[in-house]
Regions:
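A conserved mid-domain beta-alpha-beta active-site/ligand-binding segment of alpha/beta enzyme cores
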Residues: 212-245
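Catalytic alpha-helical scaffold of carbohydrate-active enzymes acting on polysaccharides/glycoconjugates
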Residues: 2-209, 234-257, 263-309
C-alpha cells in the first residue's frame, strides 16, 4: 500500500492548460509583496547564523547564540526608516501592496502593523520568527503545526480576522505545510516558485490554491545578492513586466515583486520601486489583487484552467 502524501500537485505544462481569464480581462495580476520580518536577537545553543539565506551586511556572520548587532540592526533599519519610505511610495501611487508579517513582528513592532491596517492593505502571516524556519521541523510535524498555530493565533488577535493566505519565512515550507494551512482554513499557499499562474495543491485536508512567489523578481536577490544598480533594477522589472504582459494577451500571468524594507527602503533604491509602480500603473488591463482575492477567484474558475484529473 502506498502512503498518501500530505500534499501534492500534478505536472501540467503551460501548453496543456486552458486560457486563464482574469477579472476585467486583465493580462497581468501584479502583486507587490512587502515582507515585514523580525529576527530574534540570539537563540541559546544555536550555532548556525540567525539570518538564513543571507547575505550578511558584513562578512563572517556570528553563531546564532551570539548577538550580531551589525546584521540585526541592518534589518531593523527597515522597521525604523525603510518601511515608512516604502509606505509613502504606495500611498502616493494609490496601490495597495500585500504585506507579509512574522508573528513576532506583530508583537514587537505593533506600530508598523497598525499603519498597514489603517491603510486597509492585506496582511499575510509569514511564520513566527523569520529565523525559525519550518524546515527545522521537517521531521517533527507536531512541532511545525504548533508554530503555524501560534502564528495564526497571533495574527487573528492582532488583525481581528482569521488569516487566508500564508508565506513561509525564507519560503521554507515542508511537505506538510499546505495540509496544515488547509486544516486551519486558509485558501492560499505562496511558497512555490514554479509558475506564472495559480494552480491547485491537493492535500489530505482538501485543496488549497498556490499563488506563486518569485525569488528572481525580488529586491533581495536583485540588489543585496545580485548587486544590481538602481537603474539596472528598474530595467529588469520593466523587461519582466513587458514579457508577462505580452504573454497575458493569450492567458493571464502573475507577477510578484518581493520587497524588504531594509533593502528597497534605502534612499538610493527607493526610486526603483517608485519608477516601476508608475510603469505598471500606466499599462491597461492590469489587476492589482490581494493573494486572498486571487485564491478565491481561482477556486471558482480552476476547472476552466486545469480540469480535475
Amino acid at each position: 500500500m502506498t502512503d498518501v502524501p500530505p500534499s501534492s500537485y500534478p505536472y501540467v505544462p503551460l501548453p496543456d492548460r486552458g486560457p486563464l481569464r482574469f477579472p476585467g480581462g486583465a493580462r497581468v495580476a501584479m502583486i507587490f509583496t512587502i515582507n515585514m520580518e523580525y529576527w530574534e536577537m540570539a537563540r541559546p545553543g544555536q550555532k548556525e547564523p540567525l539570518f538564513p539565506g543571507g547575505p550578511a551586511t558584513i562578512p563572517h556572520a556570528l553563531p546564532g547564540d551570539v548577538a550580531d548587532f551589525a546584521n540585526w540592526t541592518w534589518r531593523e533599519y527597515g522597521q525604523r526608516v525603510g518601511i515608512w519610505r516604502v509606505m509613502e511610495v504606495f500611498d502616493r501611487a494609490g496601490i495597495a501592496p500585500s504585506c507579509t508579517m512574522n508573528g513576532l513582528l506583530a508583537m514587537e513592532r505593533r506600530r508598523i502593523v497598525d499603519a498597514v491596517k489603517e491603510r486597509g492593505w492585506e496582511l499575510v502571516p509569514h511564520n513566527w520568527a523569520q529565523n525559525d524556519l519550518l524546515t527545522y521541523y521537517a521531521h517533527d510535524p507536531a512541532g511545525e503545526r504548533a508554530v503555524i498555530r501560534r502564528t495564526l493565533d497571533a495574527y487573528e488577535k492582532i488583525v481581528g480576522r482569521p488569516a487566508k493566505a500564508w508565506l513561509s519565512s525564507a519560503i521554507r515550507g515542508t511537505r506538510e505545510t499546505p495540509a496544515f494551512l488547509k486544516e486551519f482554513g486558509l485558501v492560499a499557499y505562496c511558497d512555490y516558485l514554479n509558475d506564472d499562474q495559480p494552480y491547485l495543491i491537493s492535500t489530505i485536508n482538501g485543496p488549497i490554491v498556490c499563488v506563486p512567489y518569485s525569488n528572481d523578481v525580488n529586491d533581495f536577490n536583485m540588489f543585496a545578492r545580485g548587486s544590481l544598480t538602481t537603474r539596472d533594477g528598474v530595467d529588469m522589472l520593466k523587461l519582466c513586466f513587458d514579457q508577462l504582459y505580452a504573454e497575458g494577451a493569450e492567458t493571464g500571468r502573475i507577477m510578484n515583486l518581493g520587497l524588504h524594507p531594509h533593502v528597497i527602503g534605502q534612499p538610493h533604491r527607493i526610486a526603483a520601486l517608485r519608477d516601476f509602480i508608475d510603469y505598471a500603473k500606466a499599462a491597461s488591463n492590469v489587476w492589482f489583487p490581494t493573494r486572498e482575492e486571487i485564491a478565491e477567484w481561482y477556486l471558482a474558475h480552476h476547472a476552466e484552467h486545469i480540469p480535475p484529473r
